[in-house]
Amino acid sequence: MWLTSYVLPRLKNILLLQFHITLPLNYLVLLLLSTVIITYLFLRTRILSNYSQLKDDVSDENNINRKDYMDASSASFLLNREKHKGFTSYLDEFLSAIKIFGYLEKPVFHELTKSMKTEKLQEGEIVLLDDSVGFTIVVEGTLEILHKMDNRHSNPSGDAAANATAFEPPSNDDGYLINGEKFQLLNIVKTGNPLSSLVSIMKLFSNRSTHLNEGTHPSTTNNTPGPGSPNLTGEINSFLDSTLPAKFGSADSANGNHPISPMELESTFDNLSEASENDRSAKIPDIIARAASDCTIAIIPSSSFQRLLVKYPRSASHIIQMILTKLYRVTFKTAHTYLGLTNEIIFTEFQSINKDNLKLPEYFRRSIISYFTNRQDDTGSSASTIQKRPQLHRRDSNNSLNYGSRHVVLNSRDQYNPGDLLSNVPLPRLNPQQRNDLSNTNSSSTLSRADYRPIILNNFSSSQFEETEVSSWRLALVEIIFQQLGITKDTIEPPISDDFSLHDHSLDEKGLVRRSSYSSFTSLSSSIATHSSNHLVTFLPRESQQFSRLNRTGGKMASHSKRLNGSSRSNSRTDRSESFDHFRNENLGGDNQFSDFESVKEDFSKCIKILKFEEGETILCQNSNPQGIYYLVSGEVDVISETKDGNTDESYERTLYTATEGYILGYLSSILGCKSLVTLKVSKGPAYLGLIPYNDLERLCDKYFMIYLKLSEILTNSLSPNLLRLDYFLEWIQLDSSETLFNQGDPANGVYLVLNGRLRQLFYEDADSDIVTQMAELSKGESFGEVEVLTAIHRLNTVVAIRDTELARIPRTLFEFLAVEHPSIMIHVSRMVAKKAMLMNFKSGIGFSGSQPITKLIGDETAMQKRYDFNLNIKSNKSSKKNELISNTVNYKTLTLLPITEGLPVEEFAYKLINALRQCGKTTIGLNQRTTLSHLGRHAFNKLSKLKQSGYFAELEELYEIVVYIADTPVSSSWTQTCISQGDCILLLADATCDPKIGEFERLLLKSKTTARTDLILLHPERYVVPGSTSKWLKNRMWIQSHHHIQFTPMEKVAEPDPIPNIKPLSQLVEKFKENTKKTQENFVKFLPDSIKTTVETLSGKYIDPKPNPKFYTSVDPIKNDFLRLARTLSGQAVGLVLGGGGARGLSHLGIIKALEEQGIPIDIIGGTSIGSFVGGLYAMDYDLVPIYGRVKKFAGRVGSLWRMLSDLTWPVTSYTTGHEFNRGIWKSFRDYRIEDFWISYYCNSTNITESVQEIHSSGFAWRYIRASMSLAGLLPPIVDNGNMLLDGGYVDNLPVTEMTQRGCKIVFAVDVGSVDDRTPMSYGDSLNGFWIVLNRWNPFSKHPNIPNMAEIQMRLGYVASVNALERAKSTPGVVYIRPPIENYATLDFGKFEEIYQVGYAYGHDFLQHLQEKNELPPIAGTTTSAYADKENMLQRRNSI
């Protein structure tokens, strides 16, 4: 009752109580508060958030355009597949086959083809391939090349062979039984390819036994199985030539060749002499061709080549030179670099010229040494080279009375020469008739020691022709070299045939008969003139040239020819015949007659140099350019072959033989114009050598062009059977630009070796799709296709030619033959292929694409490295990469400098680039139109120029590592088109201050449809890039793969003074006001503190006197030379710097960079993660340490400010902060700069948590992607880019070294500042109590380690991929790993800037100094002082912020 009467009413009153709170709010205060809020929002959104207004409006468009461009390029390759599948005629296939001869003039072409015939072959018919057949071409169908197996390798027993039919395929699909002999299939020749080998073509010119009027026919036999099949009588002709040497090149003495005795062979080639006597006497394998289907072959008989040699000897010499060049590139180069047959190549050289070791007479040898010593004593110089000349022989004293002599006065007398015996030495000289008789009996070979006779000049009176001592041994050296090489007077003269008019009597065309008769009396005229000059040369050696020339151009022989021809040539000759006569006169040598052999030797003797090398010195290094032909006067020289060990990449030497007095060295490289295959080192010295320099040798051989015929004859007669076999079965292939070699899915029937040019490998994901992935680019010296051939699978990709390319094809069947007959060669190839396959797996596993040594995979892994699986890396998203085509194996052989428009200083730029490339250790040569025209000479504007150009360019690529083509001609010039077609990489030069419109040269580039890599070179007058200007150049140029900023001021613009402007009166007042304002400011600033003073100066420079184009200084440090940086990048020797993430610990990056600069280490590419991306981006932007120091310190102060962080806090749903202050701090450092505007190449990475991939950023606004790379999860929100959320790149790769190696960096300095992983073993059982964890942390006596909390576990989980990537980076070859001692600093210790900076600098300085002292610092190209360094006028400034 009490409850209801007392409590309830009071409770009701309490609930009905009303409270009134009055807060007086003045209208003015409300207005002020609203103003503050609105102002804050306006400042934050409009002014403080300017960075958010920067829209990347061209990023997506660039990506789409680049992809479309690449797809279009791939589509052009697809269209090219059908390019050669249309209708082709016999003529097309014939012209394709004779490309091996090079360009042929019309008369030469007609001379070769007028006797050509075709033969129809039915399936199964046999063609015997020997020299009598001539040059054979397959114009329709397919032929199989078969090789007779030795009995040692024949499996069938004698009874089985006896019971076999005339033609029976054995169990092996690639073998046949013909008349009981087993033949192995080595190659399949298809339509448009020649059956004749390179050696057999040269033999068509050198085979003097073939009669010019003898017709030759192929020996064909129908070998279809059946009792009626005719048997092959006798043995099939031996391989190429029955007179060739057997196993080791020993020739039949009946042919004038004198084999090396077994004792000599054992003393020079131990490895070759180990073969048994049976091997030496074994017959050379026979070669035949079998028609695999009904086919047609075209045959140019050997008589056509002999007629060509008589009528057009210079053209024949050109063909021989072309074949010799291809013999080296196809056969010798494949044998040397791929099959490891260097020994046999050097043995070929030995057999060619050193079989008969002709020593210089002792008195000449001592005279040379004495004269050389006296010259050094007189001049007081240590130079080891003097110019001299040689003569050639020693004389049999028993026959000295049979020859004429001339007296030579010698100056040297010593204790070995009693009295005056050598004061008046008679030199033997044969008279012309004796010399001709001698040379005719030994024209095809050098003389043996027993048959040795000196080559004698004319029998002149000793009183008229008394020689000095120097000229005597110069002529003696020349004569000995000539004798060794088999060069005689008949050798240098074009061959003359007395029955030349009989060749074409069977022809019915009157024009041809008339031309033939004209040629006959011309040849007869030349023959009579030659005989006349031979009789007159004894008395009038100088006038004989004029007389001989008179005979060939008219004079007395004209009347004789009129009697032969019945009409006057001078009255009946037409304009066409005049042109024909001019061409023939050029082919006969023009004014250079060959009758005076003494003048030839005189020309060679003028070029002789004498060199002296001490014991142990190197005369010639392997892979160096040819220096010329050496003759060893005194001493001994080791011929050494250097081979690299594939496992350790170290080279080891092996002495092939030791050359003694009388040996000729450097012959093969000088004749073929190739790099030396061996090293020449003095083993017993001092060694004196006579040298005919390479340039002089080339000039004289071009003058006396018939020398090439003799040299080719000696070379072909000395080839070993293995080289002959290779020559016959290696196929030379020529591809035009954008032509497809083979398509993906084609049968793998051969291995290819790139001889010249460049190819690209493409992979199609689907046969019906145009989606293409570029796999790799292949350049000169690289091979491909081995894996498919050895595993018998189809082609894994499509290969297309980027530019005109030459290749050597090794058939699959040849591999199988080598496996049976030469297991050692096959083992060598198998090791190389296995190594390549291992490297491919290694690259595909960890993302590498470059050819790096596999040092970390073979036997040297540490226990820690074995714990990590390098295949667990998270690959980058390729669609985000702008420079998708960056090649990691930068091995450009040719560079093209092409201006975008007229007026750019291309030649000056080329001069500096070539000097920089040379400073980087690359042998480089530049070609412009002027130098090329001077080489082409009179052929500059005729059809022969294309042939001479291609040969000239190929020769330069052999001699130099990089050839730079300079497009210094107008856009309509053919030279500009040539430069575009020859470039592996095209450098487009553009003036960065001009309008970025498409230039006329770019239109020509697009019209040429080249697929070569194209880089843009932006030339700046100062080291400054206007923010955003680079993207204007790139956004409309989808064909650009990369760009480079280069400071370059043309020399003609340096001295130009600035124009004096006309100042108007109003302008004068403005200038006077500014001057007074400046004085007032200076007086006012004196009374301000330093902090305010800096702000006033900044505002004054920004608003009162702004400079639209600020001047930036150029560093005087040579390591920052832009041309050296470009040269290292283009030559694959770039130096990269990778800066890892680690928060405040990354401030030590600044000290590491300072230490690198002090050590003289240049940086060409920079990459980074998190704080490393920030510091690296600042350095890449200015490429100088001074300005970035202040910016990094300012940023550290902003991030370390507690008040700024508190003002940026937000509700912690996604992150604790909004990210505004962090964004603004980064933006204030980079402003509106884009990554493309950075002075040196730069990239950073981030983690795409939307697509779960790693993003690589190398374009776009710098602040945005650097902010993405620094976005620590939980502290900062992710950055959104095209709908993808980007976080800190350290979660996937905290040290992105892999991307750096993919960009072609040879040396990478990787700085790791990440936290150290806690690898303490844990042991707490199968369950875990949280209270125990807390007590364990507080218990100081506990033996259990601290258990990580949930946050630590999540962090470790996020960094699993990064730890694996870090271990992979440490084991990457070429990486210098740097880890400063910054473990005591936390991630957010930005307030300790100076301390962390000094720690990084001190450690970097000591670390690099330690590497240098231990000689472990990798050599960096371009860092040594060079004579090529340019001294430029540079703008300087003081070292201040």
Swiss-Prot record:
One Pfam family, short name: NTE_Ploop
Bilayer-crossing regions: 23-43
Keyword annotations: Endoplasmic reticulum, Hydrolase, Lipid degradation, Lipid metabolism, Membrane, Repeat, Transmembrane, Transmembrane helix
Chain location of the short sequence motif GXGXXG per the record: 1141-1146
Residues where a nucleoside 3',5'-cyclic phosphate 1 binds: 592-718
Stretches in topological domain Cytoplasmic: 44-1441
Disulfide linkage: none
Membrane topology, from the record: Single-pass type I membrane protein
Record localization: Endoplasmic reticulum membrane
Reactions mediated catalytically: a 1-acyl-sn-glycero-3-phosphocholine + H2O = sn-glycerol 3-phosphocholine + a fatty acid + H(+)
Residue ranges with Basic and acidic residues bias: 572-585
GO CC annotation: endoplasmic reticulum membrane
Domain PNPLA positions: 1137-1301
InterPro entries: Acyl_Trfase/lysoPLipase, cNMP-bd_dom, cNMP-bd_dom_sf, LysoPLipase_patatin_CS, NTE, NTE1_P-loop_dom, PNPLA_dom, RmlC-like_jellyroll
Mechanisms controlling activity: Inhibited by organophosphorus esters.
UniProt protein name: Lysophospholipase NTE1
